[in-house]
Amino acid sequence: MINTFNPEVRLAIHDLDKVGPAIPLENYEAALRAILTGKASPVETASFLASLHLTKAEEVPDILMQTVQILKSYSTPIANIEMVSPRFVDIVGTGGDGHNTFNVSTASAIVAAGAGLWVCKHGNKASTSASGSADLLMSFGCDLLNVTPKNIVSITEQCKFSFLFAPMCHPTLKNVAPIRKQLGLPTIFNLVGPLLNPIPTYARIIGVSKLSLGEVVAKTLLKLGAGRSLVVCGEEGLDEISPAGPTHTWLVRDGTITHEVYTPESFHLQSHPLSSVASGTPSANAILLEELLSNMLHANHPILDYVLMNTAALLHVAGMAESLREGVKIAQQSISSGAALRELSNFSTISQQP
């Protein structure tokens, strides 16, 4: 345990107390690097993260951009992934919305892969919900600890859907994981997590849990030079495209940000209350996912429509579908043909190989 004061972290905490979001970026960087390399005490780390949250400094695009760049500088590199495909996509939410819905981003990623997109999802176990993306895939038999930056290239050569378990890619985050859990507050790491996929991403959907964060994350993506990106937030604070009502979206493309509101009618689908798409345990969600991918859910089933909406949006932002409604048709074909289920089964099998 660190018993001495860390001057960089103490200075940053002082800056946050005095000027909040106007903290000098060089002081912020020095403090974050000290924390990530284990040179700060748990109390200093907790104080720093809480100060970022309470002063809303964590919602400043320049600070978010710098955080992403610093974390990626410590991440495990992945070589030659562009030889597999130059157009990988991802769909992920920040989490922490409190609605505890079915793992729609994971299901949508699989359906999109069945439709022909190269999808490498980057995620973790649940922190606030009943079932995170990693929990769900592990319940389906995927050995995520066997999927590493060293073998992900060979895995993606064999299947269009793959998943990188975040702790395998960002070893320095182990220094803050227990502190984040004990702190009980959302931290800056919740916001930047969806931006840390080590696979170069051509197109993506990122869900945020507060409407005020939509433009913040969109501006951060713009500063990072990200490709086609759609930031989404359901009007009720859902970090996905909502099946219950309006969803605010911010499209980042060609150096601009365009705001638009989607509704279930935009997809030519029915609306459903969030209670009808609630999450179960990881094992229960795995059973439901298999039923979905086996084309066993009836037309207009809430979970099916929820997945179709989010998949269609990913297909649209990636350029595979010219419209949201065309995206729905492509997603339906991915499920009914069995292609989506084959992608998941293939990844599960390959992930278990020595």
Curated annotation (Swiss-Prot):
Top-rank EC class of the record's enzyme: transferase
Origin superkingdom: Eukaryota
Catalytic activity: N-(5-phospho-beta-D-ribosyl)anthranilate + diphosphate = 5-phospho-alpha-D-ribose 1-diphosphate + anthranilate
Entries under Gene3D superfamilies matching the protein: Nucleoside phosphorylase/phosphoribosyltransferase catalytic domain (3.40.1030.10)
Residues annotated as signal peptide: none
GO CC aspect terms: cytosol; nucleus
TM annotation in the entry: none
Alphabetically ordered keywords of this record: Amino-acid biosynthesis, Aromatic amino acid biosynthesis, Glycosyltransferase, Transferase, Tryptophan biosynthesis
Ranges in coiled-coil conformation: none
Pathway: Amino-acid biosynthesis; L-tryptophan biosynthesis; L-tryptophan from chorismate: step 2/5
Any Pfam family: Glycos_transf_3
Record-linked NCBIfam families: trpD
Family: Belongs to the anthranilate phosphoribosyltransferase family.
Protein known as: Anthranilate phosphoribosyltransferase
Organism, as annotated: Schizosaccharomyces pombe (strain 972 / ATCC 24843) (Fission yeast)
Gene name for this UniProt entry: trp4
